[in-house]
UniProtKB/Swiss-Prot annotation:
Keywords: Cytoplasm, Disulfide bond, Electron transport, Metal-binding, Oxidoreductase, Redox-active center, Transport, Zinc. Its EC number is 1.8.4.12. It comes from the Eukaryota. It is found in: Cytoplasm, Cytosol. GO terms for cellular component: cytosol. The keyword Oxidoreductase applies. It comes from Arabidopsis thaliana (Mouse-ear cress). Its main location: cytoplasm. Binds 1 zinc ion per subunit. The active site is at 128 (nucleophile). One of its GO terms (biological process) is response to oxidative stress. PANTHER family: PEPTIDE METHIONINE SULFOXIDE REDUCTASE 2 (PTHR46081), PEPTIDE METHIONINE SULFOXIDE REDUCTASE B7-RELATED (PTHR46081:SF3). Zn(2+) binds at residues 57, 60, 103, 106. This is Peptide methionine sulfoxide reductase B8.
Length: 143
């Protein structure tokens, strides 16, 4: 069930035990979303996808990013310059170079935010997101 930006549930409202997650996620999705793993660089399904639509959490369906905020950073993972308001949580990592990003609803690991890298985007941020953490709904599919 995909959720729209207006239907972002409150934080932490979608908690499951590991065995419940394993029953609904692929082994790779579980490794990345629940164990904070990382996709292989350049191999993700959404790295080079620029179709109009919405990217949602593969764990709980919460809408996370609009395609209008996606850009080609050349990093090998899907890159966005901003998230749908309230959809993600950012947690500083040791050293302060990057922030871990997780789904605000199910706490699934999405990737990291890097700031100040000089991209010509409105926020000068790169949300580097694992493809396996995402599901995509084309804007055409809602017509």
């Amino acid at each position: 069930m995909a959720m729209t930006a207006a239907a972002v549930p409150s934080s932490g409202s979608f908690q499951k035990q590991d065995e419940e997650w394993r029953a609904v996620l692929s082994p790779e999705q579980f490794r990345v979303l629940r164990l904070k793993g990382t996709d292989k660089r350049g191999k993700g399904e959404f790295t080079k996808k620029f179709e109009e639509g919405t990217y949602s959490c593969a764990g709980c369906g919460t809408a996370l990013y609009k395609s209008t905020t996606k850009f080609d950073s050349g990093c090998g993972w899907p890159a966005f310059f901003d998230a749908i308001p309230g959809a993600i949580k950012q947690t500083p990592e040791a050293g302060g170079r990057r922030m871990e990003i997780t789904c605000a609803v199910c706490d699934g690991h999405l990737g990291h935010v890097f700031k100040g890298e000089g991209y010509s985007t409105p926020t000068d941020q790169r949300h580097c997101v694992n493809s396996v953490s995402l599901k995509f709904a084309s804007a055409d599919s809602s017509k």
